[in-house]
């Protein structure tokens, strides 16, 4: 597959990594698994057995005219336990390496088809200057973008840190969710070659 950078230079990339047909079910499964794995899963509520107190019967069974009650910690009482209390849970799902690789191939290929992937020889700033980076992004027509480089340049990272809807990642940090989340993905040729190596 032949792609062109912003300056018009031709870049040849593998069809396996960047030309795969889009498989919506696969991408959905991998993205869902990734988001599920990001959940903390630490929420905890108390059942009637775990709430403090409520051991004694509040009033006798018969003769009071009131509804029968065995504990002041019943789920229908104020201050009682939860009927179906949430417990800590591991939400992570297993994703095979082959599936993950396939989903990444599908996403990258779809970004190219939708013209959301912008290839550049390199993207850098002379210092941690946000204004300079904003000007470069506007020049590329991508004010809201994910910038992917082979290695994160500290100046680039610091310049992008305060811009909403802009993030800088190196190839090892890129995941399916971040690729989908941004309007445009600005990728250096070196990063594209690294993806090609990893996904081909």
From Swiss-Prot:
Belongs to the universal ribosomal protein uL4 family. GO terms for cellular component: ribonucleoprotein complex; ribosome. GO terms for biological process: translation. It comes from Psychrobacter arcticus (strain DSM 17307 / VKM B-2377 / 273-4). This is Large ribosomal subunit protein uL4. GO terms for molecular function: rRNA binding; structural constituent of ribosome. One of the primary rRNA binding proteins, this protein initially binds near the 5'-end of the 23S rRNA. It is important during the early stages of 50S assembly. It makes multiple contacts with different domains of the 23S rRNA in the assembled 50S subunit and ribosome. Forms part of the polypeptide exit tunnel. Gene3D superfamilies: 3.40.1370.10. Keywords: Ribonucleoprotein, Ribosomal protein, RNA-binding, rRNA-binding. It comes from the Bacteria. Residues 45-64 are annotated as: Disordered. NCBIfam families: rplD_bact. Part of the 50S ribosomal subunit.
